[in-house]
Design a protein with these regions (language model features):
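Conserved "HGTGT" condensation-loop signature of ketosynthase/thiolase-family condensing enzymes
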Residues: 1-115
Length: 115
């Protein structure tokens, strides 16, 4: 059996744009659940949720990337980048060959299916 080490984490969610903000919001007891705001929300039976607000993709991606990446991909890549930065590791050579990513989502990419 090989040893697994969690070296970094990242998140963009309804109460924070990174781990530090999220932990601060949790300590303050902040709730990220609110009315959902997007097109066709009236078709849903539940109209509240943990929606991400104040995310500005153009601060993180160039025009070509924005045309290729849906919102889910943008958020996923940014959270991954945060995790890599937090790890302090440089991913080259042997370490690159034994590195993996575990991703969790509660329905990512659904907007792309709708489109």
């Amino acid at each position: 059996m090989k040893r697994v080490v969690i070296t970094g984490s990242g998140t963009i969610n309804s109460i924070g744009q990174n781990i530090l903000q999220t932990m601060g919001s949790l300590k303050e007891g902040r709730c990220g659940i609110s009315d959902l705001i997007f097109k066709d929300v009236e078709r849903l039976s539940v109209k509240i949720g943990g929606q991400i607000h104040d995310f500005e993709p153009d601060k993180h991606y160039n025009r070509q990337q924005l045309s290729l990446y849906d919102r889910y991909t943008q958020l996923t890549l940014l959270a991954g980048k945060q995790a890599i930065q937090q790890s302090g590791l440089s991913f080259g050579g042997e370490i690159a060959e034994s590195t993996g990513v575990i991703l969790g989502t509660a329905g990512g990419g659904v907007s792309t299916w709708d489109d």
